Amino acid sequence: MTTPSKFRDIEIRAPRGTTLTAKSWLTEAPLRMLMNNLDPEVAENPRELVVYGGIGRAARNWECYDRIVETLKQLNDDETLLVQSGKPVGVFKTHANAPRVLIANSNLVPHWATWEHFNELDAKGLAMYGQMTAGSWIYIGSQGIVQGTYETFVEAGRQHYDGNLKGRWVLTAGLGGMGGAQPLAATLAGACSLNIECQQSRIDFRLRSRYVDEQAKDLDDALARIQRYTAEGKAISIALLGNAAEILPELVRRGVRPDMVTDQTSAHDPLNGYLPAGWSWEEYRDRAQTDPAAVVKAAKQSMAVHVRAMLAFQQQGVPTFDYGNNIRQMAKEEGVANAFDFPGFVPAYIRPLFCRGIGPFRWAALSGDPQDIYKTDAKVKQLIPDDAHLHRWLDMARERISFQGLPARICWVGLGLRAKLGLAFNEMVRTGELSAPIVIGRDHLDSGSVASPNRETEAMQDGSDAVSDWPLLNALLNTASGATWVSLHHGGGVGMGFSQHSGMVIVCDGSDEAAERIARVLTNDPGTGVMRHADAGYQVAIDCAKEQGLNLPMITAQR
C-alpha cells in the first residue's frame, strides 16, 4: 500500500466557460471551487494542498483530492457526498433540494481538541486542518478578508481619529493569505501601513497582486518612507522583511509611535505558522519535524515578546487590537498575564454589524469571465442605491483588487439584502445576462456561524462566548434550507480548541428551484446571526429581528 502524498508538483486551475465536466452545475460548482482553492494565484502552497492559514488544506492528501474530483464528476442531483476532514467517505441517496456535499473538518471531542492530539492524527493521515474556507472550498484569495479589514480600520478611524486616517499609519505583521489583505485595506481606508513579514516569497506574492505597494530595504528605510508619506498625506503600504518579535520591541525602544497597531501572523499555529525570533525559516521547518515541542515553546516565547511590545504601544495611548489570530492566548500561556488588556477587533469595531446579520457575503463567477463580476457589481449598486459607503467599496474594489483565480467579489451585507441580491443574480443567469452560474458563499467569520471566545464571540454581553450550539444550528439550518454545500469545522482562525464554525455555499443556476433555495438559505443564514445576538441581549439585534419579522419565540413572539 502506497503512503498517501501531501506533495505533488502540479498546477491546478478550475475549468472556465459553460462546458460541464460534472453532471450538473450543482456538482460542477463545488468541483470548480475546490480546484480554484488550489489555483497557484489563490493558494499559499498549492503543491502541498495548503490554501492559507498555516496548514489550512483543501483536501487531506492528493489521493483524497483525486477521489473527490472523480466522485463529484459522477455525482447525481439526488445524491450527497460526505467529506470527513478532507477525505471523501460516502455518497448517499438524498433528494434534489439537499446539499450535494456535506463537509466536516478538524472536529475533535473537546477534551482532545489540542494541537498536540491533532498533529498526531494529522501525522497518521487521520485528520486535516480545514481552517475556515480552505477545507470548505470557498476561499477567493486575500480579497475575502479585505473588506472586513477595511471596515475594521475605517471604524477604528471613526472612533479614534474623527473618521480621518489621512497622515496616519498602521503597524502590523503577517502577509499570508489573511494578513495579506491588511496593506490594501489600510490604503483603501486612507492610511499608510508598515507590514512586517518573515518570508520574502509572501512579500513577492503581495507585490505581484498589488496588495502591497513597496518593500523597504530595512527598518530605517521603512520608517523614513512612513515619515515621508504620512507628511504628504499619501496612503502607501510598505512591506518589511523581518520578524515582528524583533522589530516591534525595537520600535518601542526607539520611541516610534504608530497610529494603530494590530497583527495577523499565523500565531494560532505555533508549530507551523509563527517563526521564533532569531531563527531562519528553514531551521523552523526542519526542527518542526525533529523537535516539535521545542519549536512550539520557542514560537510562543517570541509571541510573548511580540505581545508585550503591543501592550507597550497600548500603554502609550496607541489604539491596539488583536485581529483574531489568538496571539494574546499564546502569550498568556507564556506568562503575559495582561495579554488580554487590548481588545479583539470584533467587540471593538465589528459587533454592531453582526447584530444586523451583516458580514462577509461573497460570490464567484464560474464562467471565469471578469465581466460577470462587473455586471453583478452594477446590480448591487442598482438594488442598494442609497448606501454610499457600499458603493465606494465596490468602486475601490474594482480599481484596486486583482482577481485571484476565478473572478469573485466580497461585499458586506446583511439580513434581507443577501436574499435580494442572490435572487437578482439567479435571474441574471436565467436571462443570459451572466454567461454562467454564480456561487454565493461567505467566510465562516460571520454573525451566526461561529463560536470563538477569543475572536468573533469575545466579550459577549451575556457571557455566552464559548457556547457553540450556534454554529451547529447554523449548519443544520443551512442543510435543511437547501444550500449546495455545507461545512462544519473546528479550530479555524484561532487554532485547536478555540473555535467551532460553519459555512455554506449556494449555486445560482438560473432555475426556479434554485430561486427557492436561494430565498431560504440567504434569509435563514444571516437570520441565525441576528437570532444569536438577539438571544445574547443586544438591542440592535432585537430591533433588527422585529423589523425583519424573525420568529424568535423568547423574544419576538406575540403574547
From Swiss-Prot:
GO terms for cellular component: cytoplasm. It is an enzyme of class 4 (lyase). It catalyses: 4-imidazolone-5-propanoate = trans-urocanate + H2O. Its cofactor is NAD(+). Binds 1 NAD(+) per subunit. Pathway: Amino-acid degradation; L-histidine degradation into L-glutamate; N-formimidoyl-L-glutamate from L-histidine: step 2/3. Keywords: Cytoplasm, Histidine metabolism, Lyase, NAD. Pfam families: Urocanase, Urocanase_C, Urocanase_N. GO terms for biological process: L-histidine catabolic process; L-histidine catabolic process to glutamate and formamide; L-histidine catabolic process to glutamate and formate. It comes from the Bacteria. The active site is at 411. It is found in: Cytoplasm. NAD(+) binds at residues 53-54, 131, 177-179, 197, 202, 243-244, 264-268, 274-275, 323, 493. InterPro entries: Urocanase, Urocanase-like, Urocanase_C, Urocanase_central_sf, Urocanase_CS, Urocanase_N, Urocanase_Rossmann-like, Urocanase_sf. Its EC number is 4.2.1.49. Catalyzes the conversion of urocanate to 4-imidazolone-5-propionate. PANTHER family: UROCANATE HYDRATASE. This is Urocanate hydratase. It comes from Pseudomonas aeruginosa (strain ATCC 15692 / DSM 22644 / CIP 104116 / JCM 14847 / LMG 12228 / 1C / PRS 101 / PAO1).
